[in-house]
Amino acid sequence: MNLNKILKLIPKTDLHCHLDGSLRPETILDIAYKENIPLPNKELANFQEEIKVIGKCTSLKEYLNKFNLPIQIMQKEEHIYRVTLELLEDALKQNIKYIEIRFAPFNHLKDGLTLDQVINTVLTAMNYGRTHLNIMSNLILCILRQEPVEKGIELVNTAKKYVGKGVVAVDLAGNESDFPPEIHEEAFTLARKYGLHRTVHAGETGLPENIIKSINILGAERIGHGTYAYKDKEIITCLKENRIPLEVCITSNVNTSAVTSYQEHPIKKYLDEDLIITVNTDNTTVSNTNLIEEFNYLIKYQSFRFDDIKKVIKNGIESSFASKEDINKLYEEYLSAINVIELTNPIL
């Protein structure tokens, strides 16, 4: 059995996947035509340069510009439903059995939709995926760092209505360099009060202190990226002692120049130091990747062995914000697949 077949056989999770960064290019093109949205390039091959990063950007800010067009076409319920369902279909092709989709609802109100309409549309598609496609999913709502504090509070108050109905957490995303975590403390305090989980993008772009702030001030239960944790031993100790998982997205970190190369990424060092590491896509379209590709990069550039792969996939199940019932189901499927693989590939 070759490596890709082995990776495909194992049921996986993706805990860090942005909806607006994971649209099919042909869908963006199709909706743009229907909505008369002007395009810089109308041929699919050339157009993809507008929404994908091939290689590196000079910064996270440049990387985030790739989201402009996808957000522009996600302003109607039918389009939001379509791209959500397509993301679930694409995840299934990677044998992802549980995915936490995240996005910022405030980005999708330009044509008159309400927060409730946007959130309900995504949840409706996700419910269809669970019942008809056999893929489990939950929704994480992103507060944008650069937005007024009041918007974050409004989003959390809206999210409260969907606790137990598919919305499991809030996230803090966006320009980390200019907007530190503590700005949005009130929103995260409310989220905890309402029973919402908390994950925060932190330490992605060279500010390791944001990791500690996110944990201590915002009550983060997971950290998105955490790439620069190695800069401070105190942070490594904090992550280890508090058993805070990192949502690692290796290709994205190369794209944003958070790391210079796949080889230089600290993921294997973190894993060897017994941090809880999960492997995720971040943005399948913008980063031009998928989950199996991420594992292939880890094998090629980080010398991941089969035991490492098993460990991070198991971490993904255990670190998820899924219900206990869903976690147990995922774990049973994972163990079953691992048993088959190890019986048929004893040299692994």
From Swiss-Prot:
This is Adenosine deaminase. GO terms for molecular function: 2'-deoxyadenosine deaminase activity; adenosine deaminase activity; zinc ion binding. Its cofactor is Zn(2+). Its EC number is 3.5.4.4. Zn(2+) binds at residues 16, 18, 201, 282. Binds 1 zinc ion per subunit. The record marks 225 as: Important for catalytic activity. It holds the Pfam family A_deaminase.
